[in-house]
Amino acid sequence: MARLPAWLRAAALAAAVLGVGACAVTPPLSGRAPLPPSTVPPPPVVESVPPPLVPPPPFAVTPAPTPPPAVASVVARAAGNAIALILPLESPTYGRAAAAVKAGFVAAAARAGASARVQVIGHGDDGVLPAFAAAVQSGVALAVGPLTRDDLKTVFAMSPLRPRMLALNQADEAAPLPAGVYALTLAVEQDAALLMRVARSEGVNTIAVVGSDAPFQRRFSQAFVAAWRREGGTAPREYRFDANPEQLGALRRALATQPIDAILLAVDANDAALAKSFLRGRVYASSQITDGLPAQMLYDLENVRYIEVPWLAEPDNPAFAGLPRADYDDPVLERLYALGIDAFAVAQMLAEPTPPDRIELDGATGHLSLLPSRTFAREGRVMAIHDGRVLPESPAR
């Protein structure tokens, strides 16, 4: 079977997993409804994925028992300082994404000399409840996970006793997190809000949106428009991107009649160069705009700005010294690897007997700030394409 082009593989995986925060993609980042209360899933399979690039010292792994009986929802008392990393490593759909997060997490733990503190608990598509029961039974100070939105909803709804948690997704943007739960995600909404602030700081007052029907791109453009409106901006005109020559001609004519300062381009990398050729002025785009593109095609994206995680934006940053570079050939997995790195850095602080009320750090996924809602605000790096090169600009903060 022929190997898919890099951009197509990246786009497909991104549609499934890059929205690991607040996603509504196809399939959503779990793809399964929560289990009915009477269903007891099989025990999770522990630690059967390939080792990370630089194998850390061995981890303690606890087998998962049957979930505890239903009682009032409470945070379990810690019996030590161990950190459990709970991921769908055995899932056919999300196993690769989970393995990338795990690789970043254990690499960061090894660099910190804290490998012995980490327990890795892998599970399949229906095994998140036994996995959390195992973490409770072993008395961990903190559980990192779940990774998928549906698994997180399942834990919230059906796990009455759970450790303090650092979730890697968010069940519902509007709902407050339960007691003892924190959230660190790669939510595209945060990138869209930062890009909106960049546009405002550059004097953009009127903007149009040109986007595809891809779920990730629709989420990105909707988040940008919502942030734009919250800041008092007028509702932008929105145009659907269609590669049909007649439709492209109509798009060019429509944009020519509108006095706008900039355009938000929400398309995948394979459509980016064609779409950009019909656009004039400032162009802002999603982080996938360059995923898998050959270097020569970057010349067609001159002056496009987007948000990227520092792990990819600044590979020579001294802050990342001592962390192995994963050879995924896939920016989506690289971003998830970076999420694992930051998850460990945050987990060390949250696993303290009394977690800090304030956390600020410059991480592999961006500048992280703990909010009163116990979610982490994340600001990536602003990137600009000039003369066929992608360069980071000054931080927008």
Report the location of each language-model feature.
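Extracellular/periplasmic periplasmic-binding protein-like sensory domains
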Residues: 276-341, 355
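Bacterial Sec signal peptide processing site at the extreme N-terminus
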Residues: 17-43
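Extracytoplasmic ligand/sensor domains, especially the bilobed periplasmic-binding protein
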Residues: 141-210, 214-223, 227-237, 288-296
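Extracytoplasmic "Venus flytrap"
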Residues: 65-78, 85-103
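Sec-dependent bacterial lipoprotein signal peptides
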Residues: 1-23
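Short beta-strand elements in bilobed, periplasmic/extracellular small-molecule ligand-binding domains
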Residues: 105, 111-125, 178-182, 209, ...
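Segments of small-molecule ligand-sensing domains
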Residues: 323-394
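Extracellular/periplasmic bilobed ligand-binding domains
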Residues: 157-161, 206-208, 217-306
